[in-house]
Amino acid sequence: MNKYHNKKTVNGSIAFDSQKEAQRYTELSLLEKAGVITKLELQKPFELIPKQKGERAVKYIADFYYFDNEKNCFVAEDVKGMKTQVYIVKRKLFKYRYPDILFMEV
């Protein structure tokens, strides 16, 4: 367990940070097999602020990223337990920088 009481879990050959995230992967995999979603990716990075001289880029890593065929748009999903201040700022930057991608917290 980590400081947020999440238990790392393995689903198939994939390690997840929490049981909730592993369960969501199972759900999304079934939706992908049914054709409801396509192009499912795990841990997809998005650049929020480019690197600058002497500074690294700021990135947000979505737990899941896929195309929702019913909503006709790309979706970035974050499986959340504890919402830290850093997460809240990155979520706001993501929504500003990528307005065409639907952001969902599960």
What function would you assign to each model-found segment?
Residues 1-106:
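Electrostatic, structured charged patches in enzyme active sites and in nucleic-acid/phosphate-binding
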